[in-house]
Amino acid sequence: HLLQFNKMIKFETRRNAIPPYAFYGCYCGWGGRGRPKDATDRCCFVHDCCYGKLAKCNTKWDFYRYSLKSGYITCGKGTWCEEQICECDRVAAECLRRSLSTYRYGYMIYPDSRCRGPSETC
C-alpha cells in the first residue's frame, strides 16, 4: 500500500516520500520512461519493474503486514500478492537509503518532458 511504502521510505531515509521522491527523476512516482537519471531514480525504476511482475496484484492499494524493528524492515505473512508487494517496497526503501549520498535536488520535481528515449528493459 502506498501509505505503508511511505512509512518504509521514512524509516530508511528519515524523509517523507512526498515531496522528495514523489516526482523525482524519470521513474519515481506514477509511470516512467527514458533512462533513470541517477541511483535514486534507478531504485524507482527497479521498484516499477518489481510491481510490473505483479500484474494480477493491486500493488498500490493492497495492505500487507510488516514490522520496523532494530533498524530492519521485515515483511510478514499474508497472501502471495501481499508478501510480494511488501518485498518490492522493502527493497526499494533500502535502495533509496543507499542512494541518499547521490540524491540531487535538481531531480526532485523533474518534468516528464525531459525523460526521453526508450525505456530500459527490466
UniProtKB/Swiss-Prot annotation:
Group of enzyme by EC: hydrolase
Pfam families membership: Phospholip_A2_1
Homology family: Belongs to the phospholipase A2 family. Group II subfamily. D49 sub-subfamily.
Expressed in which tissues: Expressed by the venom gland.
Gene Ontology cellular component terms for the protein in this record: extracellular region
Required cofactor names: Ca(2+)
Record bears the keyword Lipid metabolism: yes
EC number: 3.1.1.4
Cofactor note text: Binds 1 Ca(2+) ion.
GO biological process terms, semicolon-separated: arachidonate secretion; lipid catabolic process; negative regulation of T cell proliferation; phospholipid metabolic process
SUPFAM superfamilies: Phospholipase A2, PLA2
S-S pairs: C26-C115, C28-C44, C43-C95, C49-C122, C50-C88, C57-C81, C75-C86
Subcellular location: Secreted
Binding residues annotated for Ca(2+), in chain numbering: Y27, G29, G31, D48
Active site: H47, D89
Assembly description: Heterodimer of one acidic (CA also named crotapotin) and one basic (CB) subunits; non-covalently linked.
GO molecular function, one term: toxin activity
Catalytic activity: a 1,2-diacyl-sn-glycero-3-phosphocholine + H2O = a 1-acyl-sn-glycero-3-phosphocholine + a fatty acid + H(+)
Primary location: secreted
PANTHER family membership: PHOSPHOLIPASE A2 FAMILY MEMBER (PTHR11716), PHOSPHOLIPASE A2, MEMBRANE ASSOCIATED (PTHR11716:SF9)
The protein, known as: Phospholipase A2 crotoxin basic chain
The entry's keywords: Calcium, Disulfide bond, Hydrolase, Lipid degradation, Lipid metabolism, Metal-binding, Neurotoxin, Presynaptic neurotoxin, Secreted, Toxin
Record carries keyword NAD: no
Function of the protein: Heterodimer CA-CB: Crotoxin is a potent presynaptic neurotoxin that possesses phospholipase A2 (PLA2) activity and exerts a lethal action by blocking neuromuscular transmission. It consists of a non-covalent association of a basic and weakly toxic PLA2 subunit (CB), with a small acidic, non-enzymatic and non-toxic subunit (CA also named crotapotin). The complex acts by binding to a specific 48-kDa protein (R48) receptor located on presynaptic membranes, forming a transient ternary complex CA-CB-R48, followed by dissociation of the CA-CB complex and release of the CA subunit. Monomer CB: The basic subunit of crotoxin is a snake venom phospholipase A2 (PLA2) that exhibits weak neurotoxicity and strong anticoagulant effects by binding to factor Xa (F10) and inhibiting the prothrombinase activity. In addition, it exerts myotoxicity, nephrotoxicity, and cardiovascular toxicity as well as anti-inflammatory, immunomodulatory, anti-tumor and analgesic effects. Also shows a strong antimicrobial activity against X.axonopodis passiforae (Gram-negative) which is completely dependent on the enzymatic activity.
